[in-house]
Amino acid sequence: MQEPFALDTLTAADIHTCWQLSQALRWPHREADWQQFISWAKAHGAALAVRADGQLIGCGLAWQWGDEQGSIGMVIVDNAWQRRGIGKRLFKGLLQALEGRDVMLQATAQGRPLYESLGFAAIGHARQFHGHWQPPTGAAPTAPITTDNLARLLQPQDLPALLAYDQRERGLTRPALLQALLAQMDADERCAVSVDEQGRLCGYGILRRFGRGWVVGPLLADGADRAVALVKRLTQERTGDFVRIDLAADTRAFPASHPHTQAQAQAQAQ
């Protein structure tokens, strides 16, 4: 029997409906965020649509990180069409686009049973910190490092070191993504780096528009002082604005009460 739905590729005309699907789940993404994610997926992976009678009822994105790794995200099936095997069919299509690669994803509690049924295993939990940003009032850095080295704005000559550092510390081959993020930054978006006394890059962070306001991410740093300094530098003009940071749950980096005063030795944010 023919399936009542079909898989094909998302187009620019689908962005608004994708946004509506995510709004139904109370996800914060803007249409501009969807446009960016779909663009990356179509260039380096797959952007799949599920349609029934020409209507978009589901979507999902796959991103390739080099030849060995990939990730899947933004997987949604309209609530009216759930429990019909559509999510599994969509997910298998995304996996095909990442064949031969180790695949990672961030799952909601609702989606976790589906992913576990397909062989995925939980390796950690993510924690989200967000709120209206207030200037930090914490203690001075504990290490004798100058403020300029702790965090300064990215300079063109920093880019090769930033890309190498990201691949080494994050474990993903994603220079195209980072270069696209940096090239597409608006005038009020920021990238900051941290360097040591020998000029070696040992941390970076990006502040960009996302959802209800701003997100800090990616964020990587070799120590607490550098991670905190990067966040301070990136957010120094965002007082009162809505800011979000996502971190691994076992990274006690930015407590909800004062998300700018602590970070453990290796702080990572998507």
Identify the meaning behind each predicted range.
Residues 1-33, 123-129, 135-174:
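Short amphipathic alpha-helix that is part of the acyltransferase structural core
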Residues 1-3, 11-16, 51-52, 64, ...:
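Intrinsically disordered, low-complexity, positively biased terminal segments
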Residues 30-32, 37-49, 55-58, 69-71, ...:
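A short helix-loop-beta-strand connector motif used in the catalytic cores of GNAT acetyltransferases and
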Residues 72, 103-108, 245:
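Conserved hydrophobic beta-strand within the GNAT/NAT acetyltransferase core sheet
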Residues 85:
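Conserved G/P- and acidic residue-centered "switch" motifs that form tight phosphate/ATP-binding loops
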Residues 102-106, 121-135, 267-270:
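Conserved catalytic-core motifs of GNAT/GCN5-like acyltransferases
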Residues 115-120, 255-259:
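Conserved active-site tyrosine of GNAT-family acetyltransferases
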